C-alpha cells in the first residue's frame, strides 16, 4: 500500500485544551517570549522536544508494574543491563537519570580546563557539560551539513579530514572524540556507518578514546539501512551492534530512542574509568544499580529498547517527518533537506531574511507559531549557540526551528494542522520582528532567557 499508517492502536488518550489567539499572545508575553516557560496545558501541539515525551506502550506500562525498588541489586537493573547489552555490548552499563547526567559523569572524569573535544556537532547539554569543565567543544560537520537546502544522504557526518588535522595539530589537548547520532543540532541528520568507522579509526590511530552520543541510534540505523551501500539487507539490530562496537563508550538519553519518560546511561569499556564513574555516581545520582531512577523506569527502558528497533515503527516515524517537510517545502517554507529522523527543521534565517541573526529569527518564528496556532517548537540557532564561553556573541552556524515529533503521540491530522499553521505564519512573515535578550544565565541560556520584541 502507498499509505504508511501509524503501526499502533490508541489505548489511552489525553485531552488537548484549545486556546484562542488572544490568550496565547498574553501567555507568550508573560513568558518573556521564551516557550520553555509556557505551561504545557496552554500548548495545542507540543513539538518542543521528542525527549521524554513519547507515548509508552501497553507492554512498557506492564513492565512498570514489575519494577523492583530495592536500593541495591534490584532485578530491574539486571533486566535493564541485559537489554542495553543486547544492542550495545559495552563492559560497564551505568544508569543515570537522563542523558545530561551521563554526560556530566563522563566529562567530569575525562575533561579539564584547556582541553578540546571534537564532534560532528555537539548538542546543547553536551556542549554545556564540556564547557563547565573549562574545555572547548569543537564542531566538525561536513560542509554539506551547513547548507540547509542541500540534499545529502548523510549530512550528519563528521569532516574526517578536519578531524585528522585537529588530532595532529592539537592532539595534546584532546582527551576523546565524540560522535552524535543522529546529528540533532545539524537538523536531525544521520551519520553513515562508513563515517563512524573512519572517526573511530582516526581516534584510535591518535590514541584517543571514541565515544558516541547515541540518543537517536535506532533512527540513525534506519537511515543507514535505507541509504548506505551494502546495508539494506541487514537488520536494525545488526547495524546498531556494529555501530557501538566501534566505540569505547557512549552516553544515552533513554528519553529518546527507548520510549521512556526518564532515564539514561553511561556505557564504558575501560575498567578504571568505570570504577571512577560509579564512585561519582554514588555522590551525585545514586547507587550504581539504580543511578537516580526508580526500578519501574529501568524496566520501562528495557522494554522500550526491544520496541525501538521495530522496522514498521521506524518506517512510520521517519515518514511522518518527511511528510511534513515535503508539504512545507511545496508551499515555499525553507526546510533542512532531507527531513531529519526525529524532527522537521525550518531554516528561519532563509524564511525571515529581514531579521538579522543577532535579532534571533528562529526565536521570532517559534513565537509566531505559538501565537498563531498554539504550536510550541524549539529554536536551534543563535539563541542556543551564539553566546561564546568568553561572553561575546556571534551568529550561530545556522538559525533553525526544530519541530520535534514525540514518538507515537500525534496522528496525521495533527501533522496537517502544523502545516496549516505555518501556512498562516508564512502569509504574514514579512511583518514579524526580531527580539532582544533582556535577561540570561551564563550557560545554556535558551532554557531560561527572557526576551522582548523589537
Curated annotation (Swiss-Prot):
Reaction(s) this enzyme catalyzes, per UniProt: L-tryptophan + H2O = indole + pyruvate + NH4(+)
SUPFAM superfamilies in UniProt: PLP-dependent transferases
EC numbers: 4.1.99.1
UniProt superkingdom: Bacteria
MF annotations from Gene Ontology: tryptophanase activity
Principal EC category: lyase
UniProt keyword Lyase, yes or no: yes
Cofactor(s) this protein requires: pyridoxal 5'-phosphate
Modified residues (N6-(pyridoxal phosphate)lysine): 256
Keywords: Lyase, Pyridoxal phosphate, Tryptophan catabolism
Record pathway: Amino-acid degradation; L-tryptophan degradation via pyruvate pathway; indole and pyruvate from L-tryptophan: step 1/1
Entry keyword annotation includes Lyase: yes
Pfam family, one: Beta_elim_lyase
Family assignment from sequence similarity: Belongs to the beta-eliminating lyase family.
Assembly notes: Homotetramer.
PANTHER family: BETA-ELIMINATING LYASE-LIKE PROTEIN-RELATED, TRYPTOPHANASE
HAMAP family to which the protein is assigned, alphabetical: Tryptophanase
Protein known as: Tryptophanase
Source organism of the structure: Hyphomonas neptunium (strain ATCC 15444)
Amino acid at each position: 500500500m502507498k499509505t504508511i499508517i501509524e503501526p499502533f492502536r490508541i489505548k489511552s488518550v489525553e485531552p488537548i485544551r484549545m486556546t484562542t489567539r488572544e490568550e496565547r499572545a498574553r501567555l507568550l508575553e508573560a513568558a518573556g517570549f521564551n516557550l520553555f516557560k509556557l505551561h504545557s496545558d496552554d500548548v495545542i501541539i507540543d513539538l518542543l522536544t521528542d525527549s521524554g515525551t513519547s507515548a509508552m506502550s501497553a507492554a512498557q506500562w506492564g513492565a512498570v508494574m514489575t519494577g523492583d525498588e530495592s536500593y541495591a541489586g534490584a532485578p530491574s537493573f539486571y533486566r535493564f543491563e541485559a537489554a542495553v547489552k543486547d544492542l550495545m555490548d559495552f563492559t560497564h552499563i551505568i544508569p543515570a537519570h537522563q542523558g545530561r547526567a551521563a554526560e556530566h559523569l563522563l566529562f567530569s572524569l575525562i575533561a579539564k580546563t584547556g582541553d578540546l573535544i571534537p564532534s560532528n556537532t555537539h548538542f546543547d547539554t553536551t556542549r554545556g557539560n564540556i564547557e563547565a569543565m573549562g574545555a572547548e567543544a569543537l564542531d566538525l560537520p561536513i560542509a554539506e551539513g551547513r547548507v540547509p537546502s542541500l540534499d545529502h544522504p548523510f549530512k550528519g557526518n563528521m569532516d574526517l579530514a578536519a578531524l585528522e588535522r585537529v588530532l595532529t595539530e592539537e592532539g595534546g589537548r584532546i582527551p576523546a572524540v565524540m560522535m552524535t547520532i543522529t546529528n540533532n543540532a545539524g537538523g536531525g541528520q544521520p551519520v553513515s556507518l562508513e563515517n563512524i568507522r573512519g572517526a573511530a579509526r582516526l581516534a584510535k590511530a591518535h590514541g584517543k578514546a571514541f565515544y558516541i552520543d547515541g540518543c537517536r541510534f535506532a533512527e540513525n540505523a534506519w537511515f543507514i539501512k535505507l541509504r548506505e551501500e551494502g546495508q539494506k539487507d541487514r537488520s536494525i539490530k545488526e547495524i546498531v551492534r556494529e555501530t557501538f562496537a566501534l566505540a569505547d563508550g557512549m552516553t544515552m538519553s533513554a528519553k529518546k530512542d527507548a520510549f521512556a519518560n526518564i532515564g539514561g546511561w553511561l556505557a564504558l569499556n575501560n575498567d578504571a574509568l568505570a570504577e571512577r564513574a560509579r564512585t561519582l555516581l554514588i555522590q551525585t545520582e545514586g547507587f550504581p544499580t539504580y543511578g537516580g531512577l526508580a526500578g519501574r523506569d529501568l524496566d520501562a527502558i528495557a522494554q522500550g529498547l526491544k520496541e525501538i528497533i521495530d522496522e514498521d515503527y521506524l518506517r512510520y516515524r521517519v515518514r511522518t517527518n518527511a511528510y511534513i517537510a515535503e508539504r512545507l517545502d511545496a508551499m515555499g517554507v525553507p526546510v533542512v533537506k532531507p527531513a531529519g529522523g526525529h524532527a522537521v527543521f525550518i531554516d528561519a534565517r532563509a524564511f525571515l531574511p529581514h531579521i538579522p541573526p543577532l535579532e534571533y529569527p528562529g526565536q521570532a518564528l517559534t513565537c509566531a507559531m505559538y501565537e498563531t496556532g498554539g504550536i510550541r517548537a524549539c529554536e536551534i540557532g543563535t539563541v542556543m549557540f551564539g553566546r561564546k564561553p568568553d561572553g561575546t556573541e556571534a551568529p550561530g552556524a545556522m538559525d533553525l526551528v526544530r519541530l520535534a515529533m514525540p514518538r507515537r503521540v500525534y496522528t496525521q491530522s495533527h501533522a496537517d494542522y502544523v502545516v496549516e499553521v505555518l501556512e498562516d505564519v508564512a502569509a504574514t512573515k514579512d511583518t514579524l520582528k526580531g527580539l532582544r535578550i533582556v535577561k540570561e544565565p551564563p550557560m545554556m541560556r535558551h532554557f531560561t532567557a527572557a526576551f522582548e520584541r523589537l
